[in-house]
Amino acid sequence: ISFGYSTTDGTILPGFMPKPRLFGFGKYTPDQDMFSDISEQTTAPGLPFLIGWQDNDFARKAALKGWITRDTTLNSPFIMTHSETYNFRANVEPFPDLRIDVNAVRTYSEKASEFYNYNSITNGFDAQNRSVSGNFTMSINTMKTAFSKMGSKESTPASKAFQNLKDYRHIIALRLAEGRIPNAAEGYNPNAEDPVTKFPVGYGPSSSQVLIPAFIAAYTGQSPEKVSLDPFPSLKYLRPNWRITYEGVVSQSAWLKKYFKALSFNHAYRSSYNVGSFISNLDYDDKVYA
């Protein structure tokens, strides 16, 4: 049995002024022609950064210390990348010539980009157009619905799993609305219903927030009342895939030995939930309903 976890992080900060020396250490004093309001000498980029710490607020702190140029023509974004992979493996041989390999994988990666532009009027930096993009994959188990009838044009137009997907949408929408904080100032009422769709306002039948949990619940056989509402489910929902190999057929038969040197039977099951790519909405404001 083995378990592996790996994570990779990176930071790209255009306009970084200091010139690190040995092992990245180096004292830096801002150029007084550009940074007349900052005279403090600092170590850039700092020990936490050198040992691998990736601070989401690194660009803002760098701007306050005079590490970023105030050239207003700078047009490259501050970028942070992050990826993590969990890998579980197990190999079992219950008896000779029978091998069972079990594995489960969860991988998440993202890239966050944001523009830090100097504002000569406020004498500070403005953070603008933050966006997050990435992809996700996780091993799941859809065996409960893998052999369900597909349906036909004459009788049932859709499979049972697909029908469940459509039915579960309303349950998921209600759960999402109930978990949202009411905000009278913005006019949001979690009990309000769209007169056309009959779904809670803000969580329609075609909303990705509704469809993704409904899809996972329908095709994995989970309850729509308990399935994770997160589009990137945690390790709690990770399920294994497997491969079974039996190579003992020939060794057990004298007759087969005359005609075959080796004969193996294999059975494998693989199912995964994949988000090929995602990107955040530039107009999204997570503080509106806080």
Q: Where are the regions that the model predicts?
A:
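Exposed, low-structure sequence patches enriched in small/polar residues
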Residues: I1-A290
